[in-house]
Amino acid sequence: MSMKKTAAVEDKKISLDKESYIKSVQERIAKIPISNYRNFSIVAHVDHGKSTLSDRLLELTGVIQPGDANKQVLDKLDVERERGITVKAQTCSMFYVDPKSKEEYLLHLVDTPGHVDFRAEVSRSYASCGGALLLIDASQGVQAQTVANFYLAYSMGLKLIPVINKIDLDAADIPRAMDQVETTFELPREDCIPVSAKTGLNIENIIPAIIRDIPGPRGSVDKPLKALLVDSWHDPYVGVVMLIHVVDGVVKKGMKLLSAHSEKRYDVKEVGIMYPDKMPMDCVKAGQVAYIIPGMRNPREAMIGDTFYQYGKHEGLEPLPGFEEPKPMVFVGAFPADGGEFKVMNDHMENLVLNDRSVTLEKETSNALGLGWRLGFLGSLHASVFKERLENEYGAKIILTAPTVPYKLIFKDGEESIVTNPDEFPGADFRNHNIEMLMEPYVNALMTIPDEYIGTVMSLCENNRGIQKELEYLTTGQVLLKYEIPLAQLVEDFFGKLKGCTKGYASLDYEDAGYKKSDIVKMELCVNGEPQDALTQVMHRSQVLSRGKEYVTRFKEYLKFQLFEVAIQAKVNNKVVARETIKAKRKDVTQKLHAADISRRKKLLSRQKEGKKQMKATGKISINQEAYQAFLRRAD
């Protein structure tokens, strides 16, 4: 038999084996009643072992084989694996047979992001679950994100099972972690399950606890279809893939769906479960967390928290609660390091935005840096992850301006306006705009720190215009601090400073606290009177003198000498608040003259002096992009 025929036979055999396997999985699901479904999530602080625990559960239920090749299975993005964080919500179905009753259960693990920037994805993931594992590092104890995510899960009615992880470490303090669970969350210490996700120790105790304590979904296959959109991503071959929680009814291939938010219709091209990758099914039913391919080409139509109905059977149905559009809170200007690569970079940007509908993208032009974009993100980590993905996946080099936050202008006639670009913020003509009030966004920052650093951290918060709201002593030397802080201060590497003054032992989480009236102004960096738009910043008036001095001193380092004097000024409302001067580069016009030719020497020096005056009045400073790049990189 020829090699081609052999290969064709093998392909056919693999295809038949795959079809047979999928059919057996479908038959297995069909036999499991909805009362034996369990949908759960894992609540954890960054780096407490959530993705590793997910891997162990998938191994225990036979979804994946043990081994290094299957590390962090649910973290699909390179940046997720590198940073050890989860950015996109993922899911996986698992089968489990109770060794005593011999009953089979269908488990859906929804792996959620832990960081505050991705709170919308976290809350929608929780909405598809009946309970969650509250994961705590035995060596670090309860941290800020554990507390914040606990309250979010608790407020949504989830049943929480405390799991103490990393008990294999020498620094593990299991009694302390149990005490913190009892005092901070008011959960019985007897409910705590001590495990090591790394070694697999005691992992087998988790699933029986999930089956016993977490309630099954309450939906019905006989009711009209209602499905909650948990997450989505863009596939270059099939378009948008949506991760859904089927609350009621059944979703089948070929069914017409209707979005409650946009009222657009879609045809289901494919439906299936994640096991751990996409596995097509004939249908998915109430209680399941599954994927569908709806023939959607524009990912921005897939809004997290949206409800989908079956078209034609949607009359009188109410959408599921909790829908909210993502709201960018941090904005940056982005420019290609090489201006000639704008078109190519624009394609890369648009491709990345396809997979992240929470990023806003608008083209903008800078006098200093040329063509670029104004990008809106959920937070600073979100911006950093986006930049890393751009560099890792496309090899793109990009310049980011200093992050800014959305400021609110309240006009005398009651109208409101949001400003996200510092260059568009009102300056000296503030009153001419009929502006009644300026407001900036605040956040409630939640920090856990060792008590020995409490004085240092409180000083840091107060220096960043923070207002203390709460102070609570946890067990064994840990303190929980709550401060109200302007978001603008938080995005300026507040977390880096917090880590620095606590030797890395602090943790931080925050939530939106709305807008407050503030004395904020626009500071422009001018070179010989010309404002440099890429370097314009908005700040509180109390920071103007120190920031102004810092900026002009630093920018002076990156400017080349000119043949005439150059003034670098920081201006607020057309008033100079700081200045540095680059002295004129001296050119010896008398070097060829005889020492005795005094009148000729005077004439040449006088002409040079007049020429420098004229150059200063009419000459333009040539500032190369490297100067801007170096300044912004250091500012970043």
Swiss-Prot record:
Domain tr-type G: residue ranges: 35-218
Stored Pfam families: EFG_C, GTP_EFTU, GTP_EFTU_D2, LepA_C
Principal subcellular localization: mitochondrion
Documented EC number(s): 3.6.5.-
NCBIfam families per the UniProt record, alphabetical: lepA, small_GTP
Family to which this protein belongs: Belongs to the TRAFAC class translation factor GTPase superfamily. Classic translation factor GTPase family. LepA subfamily.
Note: This protein may be expected to contain an N-terminal transit peptide but none has been predicted.
Protein name (database record): Translation factor GUF1, mitochondrial
Name of the gene this protein is made from: GUF1
